[in-house]
A protein has these predicted regions:
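Helix-helix packing/entry segments at the starts of transmembrane helices
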Residues: 39, 77, 92-99, 163-185, ...
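Specific transmembrane alpha-helical segments of multi-pass solute transporters/efflux pumps
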Residues: 18-20, 49-97, 133, 217-235
Length: 262
């Protein structure tokens, strides 16, 4: 892999890692989790409209595009915010999200028929055992619901990466604009029905929270994910996805600096 692609993977890891503590900061500022995920996707959509120009892809891409938009734009972000909302500490959620790697490799094998080597099978088994051990940590008694949502986020993210591989021939701005559209509309409706008082809550969001939400929309959802799409034009899911294991290093380090977590 050339140095340029390795640097891209490093940027993606840093961006994904930073998303967790920054999301927790916004949630601590009394922004409801589902609404926050919706606003993040709304900003993604708003930024991409000039590049998307409301183009509709060929019908053969629509099933995978819809599946990707729902799994990534709706499920990943809502489960991520709910995981952090129901967790008093961030680090276990970050580690639990690592289930996305074995989930992704398994999904790529069953859906895309990618080969799983014996080494990858060992890695998959080790990953599940490692997360299972974390679940039995006595310090996490009050965080099981958060870890449950983190596991759902990991599963959704894994399927999203597989679907994105099927969309590699589409324009990246189109794919991510659809993701923003589905995520914004569906999550906004869910927020209105479940969390309520949506308009007044949006009006009361602080400037600092808007900055953090914008960071996640621009740097993480656009920057990191667009670059991930770029790499999928050259590599398989099995080749790229293991690098996802790097982001906990940055996420846990930031959690320590911001919240003092050990």
């Amino acid at each position: 892999m050339p140095l340029k692609h390795l640097l891209i993977l490093l940027f993606i890891a840093v961006a994904h890692g930073s998303a967790f503590p920054f999301t927790k900061l916004v949630l601590n500022d009394s922004v409801p989790p589902i609404l926050m995920a919706s606003l993040r996707m709304g900003l993604v959509l708003l930024i991409l409209i000039p590049f998307w120009k409301f183009k509709i892809p060929e019908k053969k891409y629509m099933p995978s595009l819809i599946a990707f938009s729902i799994s990534m734009g709706v499920m990943v972000y809502v489960f991520m915010t709910l995981a952090l909302y129901y967790s008093s500490i961030i680090s276990p959620v970050i580690v639990g999200s690592q289930l996305a790697i074995p989930f992704g490799i398994l999904a790529s094998a069953f859906i895309l028929n990618e080969n799983i080597s014996p080494k990858k099978w060992f890695f998959i088994f080790s990953a599940f055992i490692g997360v299972l051990i974390i679940f039995f940590d006595p310090k996490l008694v009050d965080n099981f619901l958060g870890l449950f949502f983190a596991s759902l986020m990991a599963l959704a993210f894994a399927f999203a990466q597989v679907f994105s591989r099927q969309l590699r021939d589409l324009d990246i701005s189109l794919t991510n604009a659809f993701t923003g559209l589905f995520g914004f509309v569906i999550l906004l409706i869910l927020s209105f029905l479940i969390e309520g008082d949506t308009i007044s809550t949006i009006q009361s969001i602080s400037r600092n929270s808007w900055i953090l939400i914008s960071y996640q929309a621009i740097v993480v959802s656009l920057g990191a994910h667009l670059l991930m799409f770029y790499l999928y034009k050259f590599y398989t899911v099995g080749q790229i996805f293991p690098s996802y294991s790097l982001f906990p290093i940055f996420g846990i380090a930031l959690s320590f600096l911001i919240f003092g977590e050990v």
